[in-house]
Swiss-Prot record:
It catalyses: nitric oxide + Fe(III)-[cytochrome c] + H2O = Fe(II)-[cytochrome c] + nitrite + 2 H(+); A + NH4(+) + H2O = hydroxylamine + AH2 + H(+). It comes from Paracoccus denitrificans (strain Pd 1222). The gene is nirS. It holds the Pfam family Cytochrome_CBB3. Residues 163-596 are annotated as: D1-heme domain. Keywords: Electron transport, Heme, Iron, Metal-binding, Oxidoreductase, Periplasm, Signal, Transport. Its cofactor is heme c; heme. Residues 1-29 form the signal peptide. This is Nitrite reductase. Inactivation of this cytochrome oxidase results in the loss of nitrite and nitric oxide reductase activities, but not of nitrous oxide reductase activity.
Length: 596
């Protein structure tokens, strides 16, 4: 196993022409952009510092119109219309990594004290060209116009505005039950193969598509919140829950002749996570959703989405014991061993085990883990929760049966971003769980079998390179011998349009890097316009096919590409004018059973 180092920034280039030859990197334009201070010093200052104190200087959200704040001397002011346009772009494209308050997490902090030192030209170049460490090349990819890039560089120099709270009153006002439980079917009324159905996020359309995993037919397109982040299944497999980044939750009854939303609610202004109770005897009883803003989670009735319990996550950072005003709720999973929800609180570095047996006397186990917790998943036994503290480059392991911290391990890479991770049996190490990274090209394996392979348990056993930095998801299946790794956010079109495939049976564990095969997914899709990015492999129920989204601009052609897992050859391309910005895909059976 080789030690991996993060992507180093190349030296300054003399001209924009040379920058275009060598690739669309933000640093390529630094000298031409003439930042107001030495770039190396500027970058050092731009890093998130562990001793930052958090001031409650709050920000606004995409849907709300606000008056532009006054600009300090020397910084151009924005009109109200310009400020609202920039605000909308920020919360649609940037807040997920940089935070509602711009305090940073997966991405660097973008508070005015930092951005004003960097200066307009530096910000303009970085937004335009991106970096291999996971910052998209918004300008050169065409996703933002030159005018929008300039607008965003100016916007980041200004103080943020304050967003409103969102409590029980607002939730209940948004809550709607379209079909009461007693009026719903008592058995499945359609002939769909629900277990092999895919829920596909149509990000910028504010919709999901339900697609038959056998025939590839788009069975239905349903309106949802904006930019659905995830789809989750009830334990019974009947109800599909989706949550948009705008905090809207839709509960869809798949038993209806034409599946439709039977209940909905808005749980905040910015959100990412939803889950349902899975413990035996508690199946489908509750749903839980977590918000980025306000920082809180809400437990809801599992049949109606009626909000029952709201808990704020504001509080003290676990290690510094300093107050944080924006500890966002990231991944939420349901325990298979206890009637508990597992809740990641990003900025404070705490994992909450929330006992849902008695909401009036709520019991919560608070585990000190590591800051900047993001996503993660269960090991193959479903007992251990493995999650990434991505800005700290760590993996945290929780024993969900015993309810305690097991291990914290450095991955050796930069900014792990596993999605739910990938479980497989390594020929040498035994059962492992894998993560890829946003900030470099590495894949890390951690041992997950404390009984059968105790010497390997909870240790980083191997690290090896894939296609490049900017990976968002890694995927395999119990019936597959292959491990698929995307590089969605890489600024190089050839890399972001491909995936790396590793043969897990050929891995040796002798310190040599396993070879991978590159699948040109975007090329197979036959899309000639834009910079289509390939994102998130998702298997069908049987593990014989893996689907990839070919994600393009809202007004450009996108597609879904289906790969034969045995031959690694193209099997099918799904194209339809309704497939607008497809991103996440969730197979009903695999999602319901936590198979990954």
């Amino acid at each position: 196993m080789r030690q991996r180092t993060p992507f180093a920034r190349p030296g300054l280039l003399a001209s924009a022409a040379l920058a275009l030859v060598l690739g669309p990197l933000a640093v390529a334009a630094q000298e031409q952009a003439a930042p107001p201070k030495d770039p190396a010093a500027a970058l050092e200052d731009h890093k998130t510092k562990t001793d930052n104190r958090y001031e409650p200087s709050l920000d606004n959200l995409a849907q709300q119109d606000v008056a532009a704040l006054g600009a300090p001397e020397g910084i151009p002011a924005l009109s109200d219309a310009q400020y609202n346009e920039a605000n909308k772009i920020y919360f649609e494209r940037c807040a997920g990594c940089h935070g509602v308050l711009r305090k940073g997490a997966t991405g660097k902090a973008l508070t005015p004290d930092l951005t004003r030192d960097l200066g307009f030209d530096y910000l303009q170049s970085f937004i335009t060209y991106g970096s291999p460490a996971g910052m998209p090349n918004w300008g050169t990819s065409g996703e933002l116009t030159a005018e929008q890039v300039d607008l965003m560089a100016n916007y980041l120099l200004l103080d943020p505005a304050a967003p409103p709270e969102f409590g029980m009153k607002e939730m209940r006002e948004s809550w709607q039950v379209h079909v009461a439980p007693e009026d719903r079917p008592t058995q499945q009324e359609n002939d769909w193969d629900l277990e092999n159905l895919f829920s596909v996020t149509l990000r910028d359309a504010g919709q999901i598509a339900l697609i038959d995993g056998t025939t590839y037919e788009i069975k239905s397109v349903l309106d949802t919140g904006y930019a659905v982040h995830i789809s989750r299944m009830s334990a019974s497999g009947r109800y599909l829950f989706v949550i948009g980044r705008d905090g809207k939750v839709n509960m869809i009854d798949l038993w209806m002749k034409e599946p439709a939303t039977v209940a909905e609610i808005k749980i905040g202004s910015e959100a990412r996570s939803i889950e349902t109770s899975k413990m035996e005897g508690w199946e489908d009883k509750y749903a839980i959703a977590g918000a980025y803003w306000p920082p809180q989670y809400v437990i809801m009735d599992g049949e109606t989405l009626e909000p029952m319990k709201i808990q704020s996550t504001r509080g003290m950072i676990y290690d510094e014991q300093e107050y944080h005003p924006e500890p966002r709720v990231a991944a939420i999973l349901a325990s298979h061993y206890r009637p508990e929800f597992i809740v990641n609180v990003k900025e404070t570095g705490k994992i909450l085990l929330v006992d849902y047996t008695d909401l009036k006397n709520l019991k919560t186990t608070e585990i000190e883990a590591e800051r900047f917790l993001h996503d993660g998943g269960l090991d193959g036994s479903h007992r251990y929760f493995i999650t990434a503290a991505n800005a700290r480059n760590k993996l945290v392991v929780i024993d969900t049966k015993e309810g305690k911290l097991v291990a914290i391990e450095d991955t050796g890479g930069q900014t792990p971003h596993p999605g739910r991770g990938a479980n497989f049996v390594h020929p040498t190490f035994g059962p492992v769980w894998a993560t890829s990274h946003m900030g470099d090209d590495s894949v890390a394996l951690i041992g997950t079998d404390p009984e059968g392979h105790p010497d390997n348990a909870w240790k980083i056993l191997d690290s090896f390179p894939a296609l490049g930095g900017g990976s968002l998801f890694i995927k395999t299946h119990p019936n597959s011998q292959y491990l698929y790794v995307d590089a969605t956010l890489n600024p190089e079109a050839e890399i972001s349009g491909s995936v790396a495939v590793f043969d897990t049976k050929a891995m040796t564990g002798d310190g040599s890097d396993p070879e991978f095969k590159t699948l040109p997914i975007a090329e197979w899709a036959g899309i000639a316009e834009g910079q289509p990015r390939v994102v998130q492999g998702e298997f069908n129920k049987d593990g014989t096919e893996v689907w990839f989204s070919v994600w393009n601009g809202k007004d450009q052609e996108s597609a879904l590409v289906v790969v034969d897992d045995k031959t690694l050859e193209l099997k099918h391309v799904i194209k339809d004018e309704r497939l607008v910005t497809p991103t996440g895909k969730f197979n009903v059976y695999n999602t319901m059973t936590d198979t990954y």
